[in-house]
From Swiss-Prot:
GO molecular function, one term: hydroxymethylglutaryl-CoA synthase activity
Gene: hgsB
Similarity field: Belongs to the thiolase-like superfamily. HMG-CoA synthase family.
Organism: Dictyostelium discoideum
Catalysed reaction, written as an equation: acetoacetyl-CoA + acetyl-CoA + H2O = (3S)-3-hydroxy-3-methylglutaryl-CoA + CoA + H(+)
Upper lineage: Eukaryota, Amoebozoa, Evosea, Eumycetozoa, Dictyostelia
Protein name listed in UniProt: Hydroxymethylglutaryl-CoA synthase B
Length: 468
């Protein structure tokens, strides 16, 4: 196979549930201080599901939606890889269940399985797919990356940081979002900031303060790794946030995204402390990126103020889905990319920096550039001529209208549904979900039953066509 170029994301879409709870209403129900969820966390609404939907049904819906909206031939997919930490079977992969969609069209030749590492699995699945297309093993077909989760927490302070959603990406040559080859900063270490050792429960064990410190430390490390590679390739250019038009972050909650961009500005200062625009940060020069810098409120205050204008233009356009749907774990940073494409019209030639983080921990800083030129030379490969502009992708995904058509559920009903979901997850044996199908939209897969062999059976809610 002839070596290809301009590899990246050709299309991207997301499935999120029809139901959501409003964070202001949840705050009142939880009897916490005003603004704790909306200002303290920076969240607006939160998606959730009952016992009728699981990671398999959501992933299947996301894939089928992508294939249908873009009229993609199922035979044109040669790799399908899933990134998720929502585990419903200790052996059977989510990818194997998605195969039922491809078997229907006679395609059983698809490489890839599931990748697991907290919220980082989708990024690893993406990297694997990019490298597959770059390799001698590539057979000329597209890759499909499916990534997302159902994030649920027990009652308490962490519950409003939940969410749900699954992103699907079509990866191939001659892409619209072209990844920068050789530019990637990665940091990994062994730490117990967030983990799920109790397989009878969906709820994680979380050390909130440690997790924030780990996130920011990983960001610091990835910044330095990326900077080193960037400057080795671009001899005359120094790496800084000025090198990019937009930045997307993994978003447990939006306030952490704000702090993270401010942290990158602080890293810029440490690399160039004599720049006059950073004069307010000079007292922190010797603090560097040590542990004390993660809990220094004065430093936070100054960096947030310094970075605010840039945050509004460079980062805020990518936060729509995370603020509206909450944390989709593996899908979070990619929902940020889709939000950006949906919010900004003129993205041609723009450069985007992306930070992906998964607890435990694994993190990467990487980048892509956008090419909306429909007249590009496309003789690179036989049938890989699929091309959509970022405006096309935004219109096809139609996330703003879809968000507005969701069903708002009261905090009382939200709590009741999650209680049912918790009890259902702990049950072993044949059972039929009891949650209503009224909240399942047409064309969505749902869990019909679990039989006596504990095999899960899914159905798609019929699409009823109206006739005159």
């Amino acid at each position: 196979m002839k070596k290809t170029k301009d590899i990246g994301i050709c299309a991207i879409d997301i499935y999120f549930p029809q139901t959501y709870v409003n964070q202001s209403e949840l705050k009142k129900y939880d009897k916490v201080s005003n603004g704790k969820y909306t200002i303290g966390l920076g969240q607006t609404n939160m998606s959730f599901v009952g016992d009728r939907e699981d990671i398999v049904s959501m992933a299947m819906t996301s894939v089928k939606m992508m294939m249908s909206k873009y009229s993609i031939d199922y035979q044109s997919i040669g790799r399908l890889e899933v990134g998720t930490e929502t585990i419903i079977d200790k052996s059977k992969s989510v990818k194997s269940s998605i195969m039922s969609l491809f078997q229907e069209y006679g395609n059983t030749s698809l490489e890839g399985v599931d990748t697991l590492n907290a919220c980082y699995g989708g990024t690893n699945a993406l990297f694997n797919s990019l490298q597959w297309i770059e390799s001698s093993y590539w057979d000329g077909r597209y890759a499909l990356v499916v990534t997302g989760d159902i994030a649920v927490y027990s009652k308490g302070a962490a519950r409003p940081t939940g969410g749900a959603g699954v992103v699907t990406m079509l990866i191939g040559p001659n892409a619209t979002l072209i990844f920068d080859q050789s530019l990637r900063g990665t940091h990994m270490e062994n730490v117990n900031d967030f983990y799920k050792p109790d397989l009878s429960s969906e709820y994680p064990y979380v050390d909130g303060k440690l997790s924030i410190e780990c996130y920011l430390r990983a960001l610091d490390k990835c910044y330095l790794e990326y900077k080193k590679k960037f400057e080795s390739i671009n001899d005359d250019n120094k790496f800084s946030m000025d090198s990019f038009d937009y930045v997307c972050f993994h978003s447990p909650y939006n306030r952490l995204v704000q702090k993270s961009y401010a942290r990158l500005i602080y890293n810029d200062f440490l690399q160039n402390p004599n720049n006059p625009k950073y004069q307010d940060l000079l007292p922190f020069k010797d603090l560097s990126t040590g542990k004390d810098s993660y809990i220094n409120s004065k430093l936070d205050q100054i960096t947030l103020k310094l970075s605010l204008d840039d945050f509004k233009t460079k980062v805020n356009p990518s936060t729509l889905l995370s603020k509206e749907c909450g944390n989709s774990y593996c899908g979070s940073v990619y929902s940020g990319i889709l939000s950006l494409l949906s919010n900004v019209n003129d993205l041609n030639n723009k450069k985007v920096l992306v930070f992906s983080y998964g607890s435990g921990l694994a993190a990467s800083l990487f980048s892509f550039r956008i090419n909306n030129n429909k007249n590009r030379n496309n003789n690179n490969n036989n049938n890989n001529c699929f091309f959509k502009t970022t405006n096309d992708i935004g219109k096809i995904s139609n996330i703003k209208e879809r968000l507005s058509n969701r069903v708002k559920v009261s905090p009382e009903e939200f709590t009741r549904i999650l209680d049912i979901r918790e009890k259902s997850h702990q049950m072993v044996g044949a059972r039929t979900p009891i949650d209503t199908l009224d909240y399942i939209s047409a064309g969505t897969f749902y869990l019909e039953k679990i039989d006596e062999k504990l095999i899960r059976h899914y159905k798609s809610k019929p699409i009823i066509s109206s006739k005159l």
